[in-house]
Structures are given as structure tokens and as C-alpha cells.
A protein has these predicted regions:
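ABC ATPase NBD coupling module
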Residues: 82-99, 117, 125, 247-252, ...
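Conserved ABC transporter NBD signature motif
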Residues: 69-81, 359-367, 379
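Conserved ABC ATPase "signature" region
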Residues: 81, 133-152, 418-435, 544-545
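ABC ATPase "signature
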Residues: 239-243, 251, 522-526
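Helix-to-loop junction immediately C-terminal to a conserved catalytic motif
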Residues: 61, 65, 351
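Conserved ABC ATPase signature
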Residues: 156-161, 165, 440-444, 448
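Conserved catalytic motifs of ABC-family nucleotide-binding domains
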Residues: 178, 461
């Protein structure tokens, strides 16, 4: 990738963006952006929310809202400026020359039409009129993207397929007409890590086999560096840095690009655990490694042999099968697993939202088995939850002060004045200004909303906090700020965390111990360092293998790759 001038030979470039500026009314959102994508090349636009990357992609696809957005500059596909092209002339380019893979496969497909019926629309772009020939081509491409039983998928409706299968379908429909360029907008952000790896591997293979160029939109620098030949780093609608992926990733020259690199979990595996160690060492007047920390005393959570069945479609489903784990006081234990692993059910059992069919759960030394609702409610005072998505977990009609105060009201803590004072103190502790208390969630950023959620959990001064994917909905730098805050709160308050995640790279940064769940069972558990350096189970190795590369020049391979690859294939089905 290189930035081109008007006098430069651009014969090898498929897509040229020159001086692109975009505004919504009087608000400019993209400022003089230029880049090019060569034939057969992959280029990633990387940036956080508000960086302008998706807006640029919409301009390339001619999907900017008509009458609301204005674009100036040049966007040339095979030498033709598509910004000035009449719609009648641009329409034939859609699908044939320019393909699009959206972020959410479930919303991109028509829920009341079969996959086959929708695939025939893509096949029609090939100019083939015979339905039988079209069907053959569709089944061939469904098989090529690795979907088991293409004929069944062809006859299925979207709701009958998993997220990973739906994304494969979208990729199949996109590549079927053999476009010259594919724009992929965060194509794996909603998928489990092993499925993400499979999808990206498949997209890379197809691109190379069919000589298709790729414009990848992502917020993840590690994925961009691993999958793209070139990078363009965006912030506030302007290019901060651009160049070969390896160069930008290994030695970023701008402060913003360096901050994105610093927030890649795989590059700093001990980031937050070391903070706890450093503080302990400072108090002791010496330095210690993580392994040298004194042993924790007392279990705050003890789960032994817990099972839980659910009825689904007339069948009994064993969601949790003999799960056991414990969390020591002041430590962080992680439950790791993908969709359907049982980790969410385990958390609901721990919180008393579901009752186990067997086994025992103890929180802060008190067994939850056979207790009255009032007793369980009192136990819940010691155990608070931070939800996954701060955009849906906070009541949009309430002001922040009331949201944070609600647990105090529920448990009857203190007088009204004392509650208000504790709310102010807790908001200050999580790094929010006092005036936030009078605002509603809609007026806060994603990071601020999650700080409010953390404040709500901490205001009753619990012993244990369950963190359910607490950063998965956030940009990487915002994620880093939240993890810094959680680490600080743990150091200062002696909190015990149960960290629920599907991302082992993130888990390595924050957890002391980990349990890996698959299909309702713990397949491996132990200290984080042991799990990372000496994984015993093929599924654990598959999760490790799915972590985006720490350095793009050195493949992140693990032992027994063949077994791990087979496990990855199973995880996607």
C-alpha cells in the first residue's frame, strides 16, 4: 500500500481513494483520507469507534445515507470514480466487482427466505440462467467455505444456523460472483475466538485462490497485522499512520498507533497481574514475581460437582456437568469457554438465578443450597455482577446517581444522606466526575457506562464481583482503561473476581487461575501460566491457537497443531 499522487503510475491499483472527505450536514467526520489497494492485496482500516473507518467503507460501497452525507475527493475502482458515477451505471458493479461482508450476519440475511433462495440472487450476477446450474455452483461454494452438508444449509433458514455458519454463508454469497474487491466490516467481531480464526483463515485462503482484493475494517490491531498486507490507522476521521502491516505493528511512529499496540493483550500477557505484584512488593519493601506472592487464605467461592439440566425441544440438555472450581480471597479466577460451554449457566447458578440439580455452591463461606429466598438475597449482597454490555445493562430512563444507589436501597444500607455520600465516593473511586450522577446513560461513552456498572456493583462493598465479559463491547483502549480500573479496585479493596470470557489472551492478563469449559464440563484448570505454557487438552490448545499473532512476522504456533486444527473445525459446527 502506498499513498498515490496524480502523477504516479497506478495501473496495478484496483482501488484508489484520494483526498476523501465526508460530512454529515456541517459536521465533518472524515478528513482528506488517501490510500490505495493493489490487485490481490489486503489492506486494513483500523481505528476505534468514531475513527471514520466504517464511514469510509460506506463511501467505497456507495452506502452513505442519501441526502444526509456528502463526500468529496475521489474513490476510483479500476480507474472509474464511483463517487460521481450515476446509480444506473454503478448498480452493475455491486456484487460483480464490489462485494460486501457486513458485521452482523444475522441481520444481513432475510429471516423468512432459505439460504438457497438468497444465494440464487448472488448466482444470478454470474449471468447463469439455468436454475440447476446455479444450484450446483451454490452448493460448490458452500462446500468451499467449509460448511458441513451444503445441501442441508441450502434448504435452511438463517435462524437454523449458528453465527459462525451464517458468516460462512455470507462469505460464500459474497465470493460467488468473483468480485474484484471485498469490503469486510468487522466480519468476526460477534464470533467466538476459534470460529473467528476459522473464518479469517478461510477468507484469506479464498482471497488468495481467487485473486480477490480485501478492504478489512477492524478495531483490532493484532487481527489487522496478522491478516492484512498494509494498514491505515485512523483517528477522528484522519490518517494517523500507514504502511506495511509488519512495519506499523512492529515499530509504530505515532503516539496513537503506539497506544493501540500497547493495548494488544497478546503483547503484554502479565500487564494487570504484574500491577498487583508490584504494589505488594512496594508495601513489602522489595520486588517479587507473580509466582512468589504469598498464598491466598480462604475461599470466597467454592463450586463442587454442580450439574444443571434444561429442557429444550422435548429433550433434556445437560448444560453444566459436574463443574467444580474455587476462587481464593483477593484472587482472580477465569471461566473460559465459547458459546454453549456452560459458563453463563455456571454464573447464573452462582448468583442464585438458577438452582442446581446437584452439587454444592458456597459464597463467602455460606452454602447457597437449601436456603430461603431471603437468605440467598443476603448472600447476594456479598456477590455482585458486572454485565457484558454497558449499553443494555443500565436503565436508560434513570440518572446515574439512582442507578448506582439502587443496590443500597434494595439492601437498606444507611440513611438517605449516607447512601448519597457513598454514591459520590464510589463514582469518584471509579474515576467518574461528580456531575455524572445527574446524567442519563445515553449521555455517556461506552467506557463511562461500564464504569457506572462497576460503581453499581461496588457500592454495597461486596466480597466477590462476577465480571461477565466486561470489556467485550468496548474498543481496545477503553477496554484497557476498564481493566486498569478493575485491577486498581482489587488492589485497594481486596476484591475477589470471577472473570468470565471467551478470550484467553485477555484472561492471561488479568487472572491468576483459570477453568476451561467445553460443553458443560471443565476440560482443564490450573494456574494461568501452566495453562498457557503447558496446555494438556486439545480444546485448550485450540483456544490458544486462535489468539491473534503477537508479532506478524513470527507465526504463533503451538504444539500439536494438527489436533488443534481438528478441534477448531469442530468448534465451528
Amino acid at each position: 500500500m502506498s499513498l498515490k499522487t496524480k502523477d504516479t503510475d497506478v495501473s496495478a491499483d484496483l482501488l484508489i481513494v484520494q483526498g476523501l472527505s465526508i460530512a454529515y450536514g456541517s459536521a465533518a467526520v472524515v478528513h482528506d483520507v488517501s490510500f490505495s489497494v493493489a490487485k490481490g492485496e489486503s489492506l486494513a482500516l483500523i481505528g476505534e469507534s468514531g475513527s471514520g473507518k466504517s464511514t469510509i467503507a460506506k463511501a467505497v460501497l456507495r452506502l452513505l445515507p442519501h441526502g444526509e452525507a456528502s463526500a468529496t475527493g475521489r474513490v476510483a475502482l479500476n480507474g472509474t470514480d464511483i463517487l460521481t458515477l450515476p446509480e444506473k451505471q454503478f448498480r452493475p458493479l455491486r456484487g460483480r466487482e464490489l462485494g460486501f461482508i457486513p458485521q452482523d450476519p444475522a441481520s444481513a440475511l432475510n429471516p423468512v427466505r432459505t439460504i438457497g433462495a438468497q444465494a440464487h440472487e448472488a448466482a444470478a450476477l454470474l449471468g447463469e440462467t439455468d436454475p440447476a446450474v446455479r444450484r450446483t455452483k451454490i452448493l460448490d461454494i458452500l462446500e468451499q467455505v467449509g460448511l458441513p452438508d451444503p445441501a442441508r444449509v441450502y434448504d435452511s433458514y438463517p435462524h437454523q444456523l449458528s453465527g459462525g455458519m451464517l458468516q460462512r454463508v455470507l462469505i460464500a454469497l459474497t465470493v460467488l460472483p468473483r468480485p474484484a474487491l471485498i469490503v469486510a466490516d468487522e466480519p468476526t467481531s460477534a464470533l467466538d475466538v476459534t470460529v473467528q480464526k476459522l473464518i479469517l483463515d478461510m477468507l484469506t485462503d479464498l482471497r488468495r485462490e481467487l485473486d480477490i482484493s480485501l478492504l478489512l475494517i477492524t478495531h483490532d490491531l493484532a487481527i489487522a497485522a496478522e491478516r492484512a498486507d498494509s494498514l491505515v490507522v485512523l483517528k477522528d476521521g484522519a490518517v494517523q499512520e500507514s504502511g506495511a502491516s509488519r512495519d506499523v505493528f512492529a515499530a509504530p511512529t505515532t503516539e496513537y498507533a503506539r497506544s493501540l499496540q500497547a493495548d494488544v493483550p497478546a503483547l503484554h500477557p502479565d500487564r494487570y497481574r504484574n500491577q498487583r505484584v508490584t504494589l505488594k512488593a512496594a508495601h513489602d519493601g522489595g520486588s517479587r514475581t507473580a509466582a512468589a506472592l504469598p498464598p491466598a487464605v480462604g475461599r470466597q467461592i467454592d463450586v463442587q460437582g454442580v450439574t444443571k439440566h434444561f429442557s429444550a425441544g422435548g429433550k433434556e440438555v445437560l448444560a453444566v456437568d459436574g463443574v467444580s472450581f474455587s476462587v481464593e480471597r483477593g484472587r482472580t479466577h477465569a471461566l473460559v469457554g465459547e458459546s454453549g460451554s456452560g459458563k453463563t449457566t455456571a454464573v447464573r447458578l452462582l448468583l442464585g438465578l438458577e438452582q442446581p440439580d446437584g452439587g454444592d455452591i458456597t459464597v463467602a463461606g455460606q452454602s447457597t443450597s437449601g436456603r430461603s429466598r431471603a437468605d440467598v438475597r443476603e448472600i447476594r449482597r456479598h456477590l455482585q455482577l458486572v454485565y457484558q454490555n454497558p449499553f443494555t445493562s443500565l436503565d436508560p430512563t434513570w440518572r446515574v446517581g439512582r442507578i448506582v444507589r439502587e443496590p443500597l436501597d434494595q439492601f437498606g444500607v444507611g440513611t438517605k444522606a449516607e447512601r448519597s455520600q457513598r454514591v459520590r465516593e464510589t463514582l469518584e473511586a471509579v474515576g467518574l466526575p461528580a456531575d455524572v450522577a445527574s446524567r442519563r446513560p445515553a449521555h455517556l461513552s461506552g467506557g463511562q457506562r461500564q464504569r457506572v456498572a462497576i460503581a453499581r456493583a461496588l457500592v454495597v462493598r461486596p466480597d466477590v464481583v462476577v465480571l461477565d465479559e466486561p470489556t467485550s463491547a468496548l474498543d481496545v483502549s477503553v477496554q484497557a482503561g476498564i481493566l486498569e480500573l478493575l485491577s486498581k479496585m482489587q488492589r485497594e479493596l481486596g476484591l475477589t473476581y470471577l472473570f468470565v470470557s471467551h478470550d484467553l489472551a485477555l484472561v492471561r492478563q488479568v487472572a491468576d487461575t483459570v477453568s476451561v469449559l467445553r460443553r458443560g464440563q471443565v476440560v482443564e484448570d490450573g494456574p494461568v501460566e501452566d495453562i498457557f505454557h503447558r496446555p494438556q487438552h486439545p480444546y485448550t490448545r485450540a483456544l490458544l491457537d486462535a489468539i491473534p499473532l503477537a508479532t506478524p512476522s513470527v507465526p504463533a504456533k503451538h504444539e500439536d497443531d494438527e489436533t488443534a486444527s481438528k478441534q477448531l473445525a469442530k468448534a465451528s459446527s
